[in-house]
């Protein structure tokens, strides 16, 4: 508990230092939307970032996506994410997102520099920052927190006694709280993840409906909360023979998975293509949100000074 108190004091003081100008922060000429969380572990940020980028493009904006690039080993920043970028270079989540969105994207641990690159070199008129809620060195205009419906804020304690990076009071200071799952509370917005057809890793033109899986299969996941993937499969009547769980951002090797039918997440698939078995499949998911959430987001964006 003393360590938790210390963590709280440090996080509180750090945010205060940026908000008061004691520590410098970067302000770019385009509005910045932060999509983050106050807890560790997977909460569903990536599908929301993809959805926001597609939605804003459809509404006439020129979005750019900024990521930390966790798990990548690039040393040349800001690093543009292209169709040829590798997970080992820029991280698995940026590669996944680049497959889904058609807008500029860069990774940079210095988020202010990355945001400036998107504005100045790619002419973006809105920046979507994947994670970075606690990275106050980049000024933001709209903050969106994503929470897992089942785990929510856990035991409500900060690290290391609990899962929180910031106190639950922070939820009252952000613009939107999006709950991935169900059972939203007052003031929260529901996000559901809708799976499409399975896609073959070796031949992406091959698709397979979940309803066509008659025999039990192996499921594998190296994400922040693997159980959410397994539960998603079970909700769609997929019979699981076994579940292989790995740490988030796991660097897969051929020996990690059996040479038989395996279902995995889209995030894991980008790291397994080079050695994929013919019967390995990934499941794309799309974020669904209330149209009222989208309209309120547009209204806030238009009111950014």
From Swiss-Prot:
BP GO terms, sorted: lipid A biosynthetic process; lipopolysaccharide core region biosynthetic process
Protein EC: 2.7.1.130
Keywords noted in UniProt: ATP-binding, Kinase, Lipid A biosynthesis, Lipid biosynthesis, Lipid metabolism, Nucleotide-binding, Transferase
Binding of ATP, residues: 39-46
Any one annotated GO CC term: plasma membrane
Catalytic activity: a lipid A disaccharide + ATP = a lipid IVA + ADP + H(+)
Pathway(s) it belongs to: Glycolipid biosynthesis; lipid IV(A) biosynthesis; lipid IV(A) from (3R)-3-hydroxytetradecanoyl-[acyl-carrier-protein] and UDP-N-acetyl-alpha-D-glucosamine: step 6/6
A Pfam family: LpxK
InterPro entries in the record: LpxK (IPR003758), P-loop_NTPase (IPR027417)
Example of a GO MF term: tetraacyldisaccharide 4'-kinase activity
Family, similarity comment: Belongs to the LpxK family.
Function: Transfers the gamma-phosphate of ATP to the 4'-position of a tetraacyldisaccharide 1-phosphate intermediate (termed DS-1-P) to form tetraacyldisaccharide 1,4'-bis-phosphate (lipid IVA).
PANTHER family registered for this protein in UniProt: TETRAACYLDISACCHARIDE 4'-KINASE, TETRAACYLDISACCHARIDE 4'-KINASE, MITOCHONDRIAL-RELATED
Protein name (record): Tetraacyldisaccharide 4'-kinase
Species of origin: Pseudoalteromonas atlantica (strain T6c / ATCC BAA-1087)
Lineage, uppermost ranks: Bacteria, Pseudomonadati, Pseudomonadota, Gammaproteobacteria, Alteromonadales
